[in-house]
Amino acid sequence: MVQVNGNYLKLKAGYLFPEIGRRVKAFSAANPDAALIRLGIGDVTEPLPLACREAMKTAIDAMGTAEGFHGYGPEQGYGWLREAIAKHDFQARGCDISAEEIFVSDGSKCDSSNILDILGEGNRIAVTDPVYPVYVDTNVMAGRTGEAGEEGRYGGLTYLPISADNGFAAQIPSEPVDLIYLCFPNNPTGAVATKGQLKAWVDYARSNGSLILFDAAYEAFIQDPSLPHSIFEIEGARECAIEFRSFSKNAGFTGTRCAFTVVPKGLKGTASNGEAVELWGLWNRRQSTKFNGVSYIIQRGAEAVYSDAGQAEVKGLVNFYMENAAIIRRELSGAGLTIYGGEHAPYVWIKTPEGMDSWGFFDHLLNKANVVGTPGSGFGASGEGYFRLSAFNSRANVDAAMARIKAL
């Protein structure tokens, strides 16, 4: 009989969001008339920007002509989109990033997982705790961890706790690690990093030969102009970092699928024989072999994000969701709950009421208020006692959810 990948058997009971889905499904089956409000998974709700829709319509019409038809595109992405990304997202902020260093993809979740294809199995890995579960689970699937302990932490990983006690800022590891996952603005806590904090990570990585995997999927939600949007705003980051970005949350592409990864030329790792190897070439080879590129139509939609109209519409979407976050912060603070995040990210991180753990608070809100959120413990042991609410929903639903919770 064929053998399975035994690493999958090390995974805990279920990926966080499917487990939430299972509980919600069971509740809905038992309470078919309940009007649930979902503030859990970070999926957007507002329509795609008009500029993007019009660009995709034009691209569809072009595909119906002999002159405008496009088959397989470049695996790295069309040059015009890569140029727009480099100009607007990086060069405009003083980052030395060229179009050739940008790889367009169908999602930053995919890229942050697939990047392991080009990295060795013996790397020592550091993640924050709490953490976006994909970083941990993909390393488990790839056989880069041991078994999970009683708290759910996997052997072989270095966990860096973040909580209110340390201002949600992970401490630099006391021992050398090879691979460091950082996410700012942070999912799930909503915390942000200053340039000084990122510089400390870059300095550590350069001193120890480490690689930072920097997830900037929520950078568009930063409100303070002094805060960095990219790791490449930090001097020396080209020598030690790869960055993941997405159009999902700022432009509403969760169902449309377009993202990109930045791999600087000159960024190197080490082969088993000690030889220095450029990661750009390995990632380019990986993408050329395993990926056929993002649809021409979708890339035209993403390009429109950088038009004047697209930029204005994206700003409007970001402002809308951040207004939702402000409502959640204000209403729940007024209800006596301790609130973090929600100022530079679309996530509000809540301290659960005394005597209630994360899943207990989840069940409490589901059963008593018919509101779905995300238990903090699902993001790691240090998330126990916290709870995440997402600002991605309609204003009417956010207002209704707050009224229900305050009435408890």
Curated annotation (Swiss-Prot):
GO terms for biological process: lysine biosynthetic process via diaminopimelate, diaminopimelate-aminotransferase pathway. It catalyses: (2S,6S)-2,6-diaminopimelate + 2-oxoglutarate = (S)-2,3,4,5-tetrahydrodipicolinate + L-glutamate + H2O + H(+). Its EC number is 2.6.1.83. It is an enzyme of class 2 (transferase). The modification N6-(pyridoxal phosphate)lysine is found at K249. One of its GO terms (molecular function) is L,L-diaminopimelate aminotransferase activity. It holds the Pfam family Aminotran_1_2. Substrate binds at Y15, G42, K109, Y132, N187, N292, R388. Keywords: Aminotransferase, Pyridoxal phosphate, Transferase. Its cofactor is pyridoxal 5'-phosphate. It comes from the Bacteria. InterPro entries: Aminotransferase_I/II_large (IPR004839), DapL/ALD1 (IPR019942), PyrdxlP-dep_Trfase (IPR015424), PyrdxlP-dep_Trfase_major (IPR015421), PyrdxlP-dep_Trfase_small (IPR015422). Pathway: Amino-acid biosynthesis; L-lysine biosynthesis via DAP pathway; LL-2,6-diaminopimelate from (S)-tetrahydrodipicolinate (aminotransferase route): step 1/1. Pyridoxal 5'-phosphate binds at Y72, S108, K109, Y132, N187, Y218, S246, F247, S248, R257, N292. Homodimer. NCBIfam families: DAPAT_plant (TIGR03542). Belongs to the class-I pyridoxal-phosphate-dependent aminotransferase family. LL-diaminopimelate aminotransferase subfamily. Involved in the synthesis of meso-diaminopimelate (m-DAP or DL-DAP), required for both lysine and peptidoglycan biosynthesis. Catalyzes the direct conversion of tetrahydrodipicolinate to LL-diaminopimelate. This is LL-diaminopimelate aminotransferase. The gene is dapL.
